[in-house]
């Protein structure tokens, strides 16, 4: 019968656990949502926004959901950005597509290191924005479509976390 070295097994399991703990060092903790009053109402109307976001995170065994701060315009966004750090800025483009693009550019000039993602209401809006991709790509990193589910916000946060953690995670794991 082969002798099993329990100490060796324990060290290997402990090492695997330690590596797992070191994966994903960057987490999105603070999100600034810029959406006009109508779009903010639409997002909240779909249900208990904060509760649903937290629920999405819990379903994936993620226990720290990001905190959302919502503002209605560029002025409000700049005010909040002066007060504290945000990991991610989500700009909602409703009927008016030009104002969110201009807002994004102004914010990028002042805060070039904060990722900005755009959220549109439907696929037609997506087509419009993709046709002017060169114009928005200077400040907006990616465009997502609001389909009535809060899961899109989880996807946006995970997109940024994966992008930032990619290099470190592939070296570790």
Predicted regions mapped to residue ranges:
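Conserved phosphotransfer microenvironments
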Residues: 42-45, 51-54, 65, 70-78, ...
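As written
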Residues: 130-148
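Conserved catalytic or regulatory cores that recognize and/or transform ribose-phosphate-containing ligands
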Residues: 126-128, 135, 162, 170
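A general structural signal for stabilizing positions within well-ordered secondary structure
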Residues: 22, 59-60, 80, 108, ...
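Short glycine-/polar-rich loops that comprise or flank the Walker A/P-loop
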Residues: 28-29, 113-114, 140
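Structural signal for conserved beta-strand scaffold positions within catalytic alpha/beta enzyme cores
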Residues: 33, 70, 118, 144-145
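Non-catalytic signal-transmission and effector/linker regions of two-component phosphorelay proteins
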Residues: 1-67, 87, 149-173
